[in-house]
Amino acid sequence: MVSKEYSRIGETLHHAELENGLHIYVDVKPEFSKSFAFFATNYGGMDMRFKLKGEWHDTPAGVAHFLEHKMFDTKDGNALQDLAANGASPNAFTSTAITGYYFESTEKFEENLK
């Protein structure tokens, strides 16, 4: 993990890249009572064409938003309900270029992160 200090604002941002290419950023703020997690992917409403194994595939409009909702489906119901029942406030959004998922909680943060 690489850490970068921002002395003018008294913060240190920690960064790591996982083997699968996912970038993780952690900003520890011990004075905060809430914890936040945010995941974003570079796939949004304008992304209706993608290349897989050298072949182009076209998708209908709205696929990114549809997938945003499908990501919360679980074998036993819905991850939004599970997070809320565990004290978190979850949500998601799809913009033109990205889809983001996030939650905040004051307790059980690590459990909700899993």
Report residues per predicted region:
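His/Glu-rich zincin catalytic helix
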Residues: M1-A79
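Active-site-adjacent, His/Asp/Glu-enriched structural segments that form or flank metal-binding
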Residues: D58-P60, H69-K114
